[in-house]
Amino acid sequence: MNFRVRPVRRLSGECEVPGDKSISHRAALLGALAEGVTEVAGYLEAEDCLRTITAIQMLGVEVTKKGPGHYRIAGAGPGGLVEPGDVVDCGNSGTTVRLLIGVLAGQPFWTLLTGDDSLRRRPMKRVAEPLTRMGATIVGRSDGGRLPLAVRGVARPRAIAYDTPVASAQVKSAILLAGLAADGPVTVREPAPSRDHSEVMLRAFGARVERPDPLTVTLHPGPLRGTAVQVPGDISSAAFVLVAGLLVAEARVTVRRVGVNPTRTGLLDVLVAMRALLTTAAHGGPPEGAGEPMATLGVSPAPLTATTVAGALIPRLIDEIPALAVLAATARGTTEIRDAAELRVKESDRIAMLARELGTMGVRVEERPDGMAIPGGQRFRGARVASGGDHRMAMALAVAGLVAEGETVVEDAACVQTSFPTFVDTLNALAGGEAITVER
């Protein structure tokens, strides 16, 4: 499936984006482990998160769909999961497989895990190493560093204090999930803060979680209690709508009910630094469900100034960098992105892909080992470009096509179903017509 994108001069209106992918995964997994029933509203019904639903069902958890994005999960409770009767296929979802390995590290049975071609190339050693220290057996390709993997957990994992080599919410979360059944407190220390959705949600499910400082988290083992979870809109999906609203000449775009957890709002900080016209209005009342704040975000075009994105900002916007790169090409000055080598092991090598595909559209991107430099003041030229099967690349290239000279074709665009299945409908509604058409 390809996207054919024609340039537009106007975007106007309000929209919502689908539920947060990170929070949806965690709601399903914690609901599966909890005692009692968990009701999840706003669950992201995209391919990645549906893989997590299928995975917990294969582990013996009863899941009932009550309506669009509304799921009832009858938790198995401690020791209640069962050995799956078949291989668990995680598709393209790195979050599913890495967090699931953490869950399985505390289960005394074998589970076989695999994924699609892209996921089988992605690194798993960073998760396997600490869980092996906790007592799990993890074997597979590349000495347990690539899927397919076989995981055998233990009923009582060993408590550990672990220093992660990189700031990674997935590694941290896997250790914490294994730690729920551990023989003592589990501590994770990171070199920089990463997203804290797991900690927030664990508390909502009744776990005792301590944060002595921004880089350290300690979990005390114990059972979870089922609860209600309201999933906010995904800021990583909203990023593409916001960038479109900042680029299109006559635009005024509002995105409602977006999750604005401070560990995820790096993009908003960068937009302020670039002098974007951005408004933020907090969602009324206390945070809902799992305790995640929401806001309404509004944008309209204005001259932008280049900035530097590096250091502690990177974990707070790692998934938004493809959208940010498109925006940076139009700013005044050169935008520098550093300390982002993690981009090379996402669904694609996003550093190389951005340099190559934006280059095809006439935009120069200087590739660096851990990031890129993007000179501003450039114009996009319509072209035939490749997503590489990467959902965020497909959406970034489509947004660039909205302001390109001539039509743009984005190849292999079905991958947007991974995180933002309503992407085309949302942008077409704001454009008041078919800015993006789907070619099958």
Region roles according to the model:
Residues 1-440:
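Structural preference for solvent-exposed beta-strand-turn elements
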